[in-house]
Regions:
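Histidine-centered catalytic/metal-binding microenvironments
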Residues: 122-175
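Glycine-rich, aromatic-lined ligand/substrate-binding cores of catalytic
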Residues: 1-61
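Conserved functional hotspot residues or short segments at active or partner-binding sites
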Residues: 35-145
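Broad hydrophobic/π-residue packing in well-ordered secondary structure
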Residues: 4-9, 63, 68, 147, ...
Length: 175
């Protein structure tokens, strides 16, 4: 990863690897920007900024990946700007962008072809529920609520497996 900013957004932007949208590989800002030839970056940035996702802002971008999806092709999309790391939730932002793109471009957006019967996205998300919810038109807020519930359940269940006490400074609600 080229920068700290890339690392901050990666937990939510890596989900685009399971779609036909470029996650910015082959550019100087992988995972900080997403796009494809079919996206209108101005329109998408407007929709995403209207969601008021905590700690995030979006701007339209153009890029041409040197490798990866759409290598050598002009892509339009958005760049994620983290305004406040203390409230930024990478997974929430990723889900918000996915839901917006799926809603805006239902005929063009695609999940990558399943590998051995399992969608690549499902491997990244750890479940097929997120993909199915996005396909059903579930809002970004509802996706985040469900993910947060599952995260809390996991954090409770893992307690008996921890070898060391959890440091008080670790924010387990992040990502």
């Amino acid at each position: 990863m080229p920068t700290v900013d890339t690392a901050v957004v990666y937990p939510g932007m890596c989900f685009f690897e399971g779609t036909n949208i470029s996650e910015g590989r082959g550019t100087t800002k992988p995972f900080e920007q997403i796009g494809s030839p079919y996206i209108d970056g101005d329109a998408l940035a407007g929709v995403l900024n209207d969601l008021n996702l905590p700690g995030a802002a979006f701007r339209p971008v153009f890029f041409r990946p040197s490798f990866g999806k759409y290598a050598g092709e002009s892509c339009r999309g958005i760049q994620v700007h983290v305004l406040d790391r203390s409230v930024f939730r990478a997974v929430s932002v990723g889900f918000g962008i996915l839901a917006a793109v799926r809603g805006m471009y239902p005929g063009a957006f695609e999940w990558r072809v399943p590998n051995r019967g399992i969608h690549n996205f499902d491997k990244l998300a750890g479940t097929d529920r997120v993909r199915r919810a996005i396909d059903a038109g579930t809002s970004a807020a509802d996706l985040e609520r469900d993910w947060a519930r599952d995260r809390r359940l996991f954090m409770e269940q893992r307690q008996s497996c921890l070898l060391y006490p959890q440091a008080a400074a670790i924010d387990t609600n992040r990502a």
